[in-house]
Every structure is written in structure tokens, then in C-alpha cells.
Amino acid sequence: MKKLLNTLYLTQDNFYLTRERDNIVIKQEGKVINRFPYRIIDGIVCFSYLGASPSLIELCAENQINLSFHTPQGRFCGRFVGATNGNVLLRRQQYRLADAEMSIEYAQRFILAKISNSRKYLLRFKRDHRERIDTHLFEEVNTELTWAMEQVQLAEDKNSLLGIEGQAANQYFRIFNDFVLNDKETFQFNGRTRRPPLDCVNALLSFGYSLLTYECQSALEAVGLDSYVGFFHTDRPGRASLALDLVEEFRAFIVDRFVFSLINKGQITKKDFEFKENGSVFLSEKGRATFLELWQKRKHMEVEHPYTKEKVKMMLLPYVQAQLLAKAIRGELESYPPFMI
């Protein structure tokens, strides 16, 4: 089990990372802003264009500290990792399964978990806020998601599965405006938009999914899997397809719940966004800092894992699933148990 230490988030776009002996040093315009012993850091997420010194990159690589770079708006650019953990036999088996008919079984499990967890969030929200939502719409979407779960298990190929997943996602998005209980004008949701996000809700979702993808990619590589070879998401240069597969299980449970909690508690407001002339919307520097501060706290919340029945900190969940996936690929488990609440 990977120990959860601390992830260092650099939110200002003029920060520069360097190294002084055993310390990670943050500089701004040549002035030292802060320093941290590398032993207490397990990951660095940088939203800066300035980058990092070769000595800092070497320190991270030698000590398995994941270092990822994002644009100030949160779009993932790239990452540095040290020597690959795990053994070549695991990856060879992963590649065989990804190219074989069995890949559909893994893909089905990722998507079944995605739809199931979306449905569970819907039902929980309906239970807690019955007086403030369109219960008829919720029941209608619940029926559609239940049907989609049945169809996922009957899908015979990835194209069929892709169609079912897309229909289920569209149904789920129909109720997003009902998830907003505070400042509905600012947080009006008009459908999922990416690159760029075109409203405040999409800006929050995209930022959260980017962070979650980083966590999932780190988890997969920590157990020795190739995060770029997936089962549901097809291979594409530069795309961490297996990380995106794993993200599907956690979208609703980790990111969606968190985003609507921020909105409904008034922890993120209109002033935390930047509205561009082309219609795109991004979190401001202050908005990113608020999001990340609360995200970091959320990571330490404990939940009971549905398969192991043990208490697990929230952001250790991708590591547990990565371990279970590796066991399934090795043949130590009869099948992969996805994260389903």
C-alpha cells in the first residue's frame, strides 16, 4: 500500500522549482518562497509555465516523487517519473489482455462502475434534497441508468459499450442543474464542455478530473502497470488510456460530489472564475487555490472500501484499485472488482 504523504500544489504561474541539498525549494522571481524536505512529499502538481531545474527533476526521479505539469487553467501537459516499478511479466500480460477479446470484460467493469456510482450519487442526492429537486426527472434518469447498467453487461464489443456509456452520460448530465442548490444563475450547466470549458460547472469538473487523472496515473505506475495501455479508452499518442479507464470509476464518487459540495456550501463563487472573450471559463488563481486547499483536505477523509471492507483514505482509493487490477491481470483474482459504492 502506498503511504499517503503530501502532495505539493503550486498554483501561481510564476513559481519555479529547484533543489537545495535534500530540500524542494520554491522560488518566485529569484526569491525563495518556501522549502520542504523531499521525504515528506510524494507528489508535486505544478500550474506554472516556468518549470523546474534538472537537479529537482533528478531528486524527484530518484525518490519516486511524481512531478506533473499543468497549464495555469489546469490542463495536463506532462509528467516526470523515476524508474518503473513492478516487473515486465505484469506488463506483458497487460498488453496481451488489452489486445485480446478479454479486454471487453475489463472495459465493461470500468463502465459498469461509472454508471452505478453515478446512479448511487443521484439516489443519495434525491434522498437528502427531495424538496428542492425535480423528483420526476430524477426517477426518469434513474430508470435510464439502471437500463444502461444491464446493457453494459450484454455489450459484445467496445463500439457497443461506447454507445451505451455515451447515452448514460447524457442522461446523468440532465440532472446536473438540480444538483446546484446555490446561486443557480452563476452555476447554470448547459451540457458537458471541455477544452475549453464554457461555464463555471464545467470549469470545476475539468479541473477536478485533471487532478483525479494524475492520481490514477500515479497509482497505476506505482504497481507496475503501463498507464498508457487501456481496455476501454483506445491507444492514442500521449494519452494515459488506462488512467482514464480507472478515472471512470471515481468521477461521480470523488469529483462530482466534491464539485457540487463546493458550490452548494458557497465555498466557490462567481468571483473565483475568469471569463474569457471566446466564451471559455476557467478558475482564477484564487479559485484554484481554494479548490486545491479543500481537495487536499478531502483526500484525508476515510471511506469503507466496498471490496476490502477496510477504512481507506479517499485518495488512496486509486492505489487500492490499481493493486486489485494488477492482481486480476496476473490471474491472482478471478476477475477485476471495480470500485462500486
Where are these regions (language model features)?
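Active-site helix-to-loop segments that bind/position phosphate- or nucleotide-bearing substrates
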Residues: M1-E20, K27-E29, R35, N87-Y228, ...
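Terminal-proximal segments
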Residues: M1-P72, G82
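A surface-exposed, charged beta-strand/loop segment in the N-terminal or early-internal portion
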Residues: S48-K120
